[in-house]
Regions:
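Short, solvent-exposed loop/turn segments at secondary-structure boundaries
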Residues: 63-68, 95-100, 245
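Conserved N-terminal subdomain of the carbohydrate kinase-like
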Residues: 1-58, 256-269
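A short helix->loop->beta-strand "cap" motif at the edges of active sites that frequently abuts
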Residues: 76-83, 158-162
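Active-site beta-loop-alpha junctions enriched in small/polar residues
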Residues: 29, 58, 89-93, 120, ...
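Conserved post-catalytic alpha-helical subdomain immediately downstream of the catalytic base
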Residues: 174, 187-263, 267
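Hydrophobic beta-strand scaffold residues
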Residues: 84-85, 116
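Conserved phosphate/ATP/ADP-binding segment of small-molecule kinases
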Residues: 94-188
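Catalytic-core regions built around general acid/base machinery
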Residues: 68-81, 103-111
Length: 269
């Protein structure tokens, strides 16, 4: 969207090295989303012929008007019968207009059919403590019964939600992470899990969550309710993103699928 300010929102990323943590500084003031006002977007036109409306907690964090515009769009999309996909995307440093993140995110999630987030984001948005993920390698065993009970509790809070998707990460060192994924299908009352990726070295962790969500939406649209396949595809895309510099996951569907079934490292000729 072009506005009179013509400012592009930026973020500045300081990489983690050894004992030094990574740090993100946001520069979103006067960007198009920051200056968004209710009524500026003609949602009826935007949503025409759409099947899925995807919303993000980042947009809701930028300003009250951006949040209210997002909520307007969600309510209209629900009325039109669209699938609502919500990425919690909690970014503490973006919130500053007076409302509590929990209250806003909780409301957004109540309208959603599919909810994405990592373990910490689910805790902030729901108020329910997360289950620790402490994998040091790919042999770690996830407590499936504990997660099943956890997601049943989440479904009580968000009864409209049909699929709850969580990426879990353990940062062992700045360049060594373990990564896994979970999907709870509320209709089936069934939990799906993935393999654990033991990733070392990490090239760039930025955009890993976005890669996970984008891959899931793609998979869900293409393969429907093949829950295990969609989850495996999503985590594979997310894992690959850790090896790619920059914020974009420059990878093809074929590469993601190949990574699902291989250990990597081979020369592709």
């Amino acid at each position: 969207m072009k506005t009179k300010t013509n400012v592009i929102g930026l973020h500045h990323f300081e990489e983690a090295v050894a004992m030094r943590n990574s740090r993100v500084v946001y520069d979103r003031k006067n960007s198009s989303f920051y200056t968004l006002k209710r009524g500026m977007v003609k949602w009826n036109q935007v949503l025409a012929d759409a099947a899925v409306f995807h919303c993000s907690g980042i947009t809701c964090a930028i300003s009250r008007d951006a949040m209210e515009s997002t909520m307007d769009a969600i309510k209209l999309a629900v009325a039109d019968g669209l699938t609502i996909a919500c990425d919690i995307n909690y970014r503490k440093n973006l919130w500053g207009y007076g409302l509590e993140p929990h209250d806003v995110l909780f409301q957004m999630m109540q309208y959603s059919d599919i909810i994405f987030g990592d373990q910490n984001e689910w805790e902030v948005a729901s108020g329910v403590p997360h289950i620790p993920f402490e994998a040091l390698d790919e042999n770690y065993e996830i407590d499936k019964e504990a997660y099943l009970a956890y997601f049943r509790k989440m479904h009580h809070l968000f009864p409209k939600c049909k699929k709850m998707v969580m990426a879990v990460r353990n940062q062992i060192a700045s360049s060594h992470h373990t990564l896994s994924g979970l999907l709870y299908d509320a209709v089936e009352d069934q939990l799906y899990t993935t393999r654990i990726y033991d990733i070392e070295p990490i090239v760039d962790p930025m955009g890993v969550g976005d890669a996970f969500v984008a891959a899931y939406i793609h998979a869900h649209q293409k393969w429907g309710d093949k829950n295990q396949y969609c989850l495996d595809f999503s985590l594979s895309a997310s894992a690959i993103k850790n090896t790619i510099p920059g914020d974009q996951n420059l990878v093809s569907e074929e590469e993601i699928i190949n990574n699902m079934t291989s250990s990597g490292g081979r020369i592709q000729r």
